[in-house]
């Protein structure tokens, strides 16, 4: 059965590839048990301690060892030499299951040249063996046990309800709107009162400064009204003096010169 195969055949192997090169390359896939180089055939057999090492190594077919791209495939008919018993005992605890995607990422980080589809094959391998789904299932199981999602949702809803309750009890939103509206109306009224008093605008210099300050606070409406009043001044000097508002008396420029 292919699932029990621990050896792979490396074809198209460069004559310059050494045993060290081969071992370094395949050590990312798993613990290498033995390497059998067939120099006359430009190939080699690599045997791993675990079947997963061989399965992961096949995903690296098309990568380069030394200066040449190689072909890697399972070797079910190859009989590896028996490993020393002492070596097996000493290294048995070091075998770990690792994701193929991690293997590919590590090799790329080390500068190995891999096949263009190595990453895709590694992801498919992990999904097939349930590495990704197992991790996702673990998170879902934990979420189900402690109810994290429900707690976060409930917490958010509670905060929103509290905010609404405070707003309804104290009418924060409506009161804020009312304050802005009242302030806007007050400034507008003050601007209108000054602007209607044309005598003050024409006869007293400090009134112009006061008007500018009020008009600026009132906004564009006050500014447009001011321009309209100033435009009408030259054509109606007599009317402004004859029809004075109740409570006002004429002020002549001569009075200012005496002072």
Swiss-Prot record:
A single GO cellular-component term on record: plastid
KO phenotype (gene knockout): No visible phenotype.
Gene: BPA1
A Pfam family recorded for this sequence: RRM_1
Positions of the UniProt region annotated as Disordered: 219-259
Main location: cytoplasm
PANTHER family: BINDING PARTNER OF ACD11 1, SERINE/ARGININE-RICH SPLICING FACTOR
This protein's record includes keyword Transcription: no
Ranges annotated as spanning the membrane: none
Quaternary structure (record): Interacts with ACD11, PR1F2 and PR1F3.
Organism: Arabidopsis thaliana (Mouse-ear cress)
PROSITE patterns associated with the record: RRM
Listed name of the protein: Binding partner of ACD11 1
Entry keyword annotation includes Oxidoreductase: no
GO molecular function, one term: RNA binding
Assigned keywords, A-Z: Cytoplasm, Membrane, RNA-binding
Gene Ontology biological process: defense response to fungus; negative regulation of plant-type hypersensitive response
Amino acid composition bias (Low complexity), ranges on this chain: 232-243
Locations listed in the record: Cytoplasm; Membrane
RRM domain segment(s): 6-77
